[in-house]
Amino acid sequence: MPPNLLLLKRWLVGAGIIIVLLLLFREELPAVTDLRGRQVDRDGFVSRTEMMAVVREWQKRERIRKIVGLVFYHKRQQAAILDCYLKRDLAKNGGVLDQVIWLRQTDDARDVEFLDKLVRSEAHYSWRNQEGSDGSAYDGIQDDLLYIQIDSGIVYMEDGTILSMAHTRAMRPDFYLVSANVVNQPLSSWLHLSLGAVKPYLPDNETWAPVEAESGVMNWRPSRLPSWRGPPDFDVAKWNPPADRQHLWLPVTGKTDHLLHNTPIVHTVYDAYKDQGRWKWMAAAQQHYSLLENLERGELSKYKFHLWNYQELGMGTQLVAMTGKDINAAKPIGAAAERHFAVTMPRKIGRPAVADGRRVAAYYSSKDQSEGLGQTDILERYRSFAQEHVCKGRMLWTRNADHV
């Protein structure tokens, strides 16, 4: 047989096999119209419209009357930032929150005064005192509500974060608790490091924070910062911040390998209960600057995943969704409420605590990070970002407010 005919024969046999396989398995290949009907966004996740429809249908089916934000209020400096995000997420503004309850957990006079101002600024806000132990925060919880528990230290929420959490809870009744994808939590810090979201940053005592000359407002963009300059053998463990002012963390540039070498994040471990000492606040600083850089570059996709089951290892509860029925079934709730919800109850009832990785949020500071982070300009950078991109009108508190 001539070579050309032999090649043609082989080609026809191969094409025939492919056609047969396509016919056999055609039911598993979705049509273009099927893909279009799923309403996926550019990241490949379900669209906002479809998520909202699923949540509303779930509410009707399960008789969930409202979706309520339950905010654990501590400090006005952070809560003023969160306020902008919560107002954006109110149902009347296209979000899912029907109301927000601010739970006062401070006796500081200026914080209490600001809370009153905050609640008066929005008809769908209310507040109440917490009496007694941590468990008393859950007095008055109603079975037929979905609660979004929020720490007032949440200083960034990607648009659709709360909706995404509610959607996951609606789709997966086998989940006990659904968290957002939160930057600066013990286990998620290791996860974000592993996903490649954390950038190389090191502290600097010489450079002053950039401020816009006309407005006097800090520019949140890390691209405005100079590169970090220091000796190759710089030991961040022996470094101390300046005593008289805030300091910056600067991007380490010009390296092509070992990018994170000698930066605090490399000390992060997948263990929520291991004491990391001063590494904990320094790793937080590096993560916050990294998030701001990724926001500026439009690269939040670096953080994302669908679901992550923490396997009872101690997930943070700074931004979580729980039904009132599930909260009430967990009573009595003692002083260690976070561990009770994230570890004890999932272990007891066999329903896991998971993170919804489709939207990103940021938690500013735990108690053992607050002193160190308070010596940085990070909070003001988040304030500047929110004022520019989220707030409708001027933020209710700025750093000059206490000096008026």
Predicted stretch roles:
Residues 144, 155, 159-171, 225, ...:
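Short alpha-helix within the catalytic core of nucleotide-sugar-dependent glycosyltransferases
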Residues 101-149, 155-163:
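Active-site-proximal specificity loops/subdomain of glycosyltransferases
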Residues 98-102, 117, 122, 182, ...:
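Long, low-complexity intrinsically disordered regions enriched in Ser/Thr/Pro/Gly
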Residues 3-50, 64, 82, 233-404:
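C-terminal catalytic/acceptor-binding lobe
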Residues 160-207:
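Conserved donor-nucleotide/metal-binding helix-loop-beta segment in metal-dependent transferases, i.e.
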Residues 68-76:
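A conserved hydrophobic helix/loop-capping motif in glycosyltransferases and polysaccharide synthases
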Residues 47-57, 75-93, 161:
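Short, well-formed alpha-helical segments that are part of the catalytic scaffolds
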Residues 62-67, 90-101:
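Short loop->beta transition adjacent to catalytic acidic/histidine clusters or analogous donor-positioning motifs
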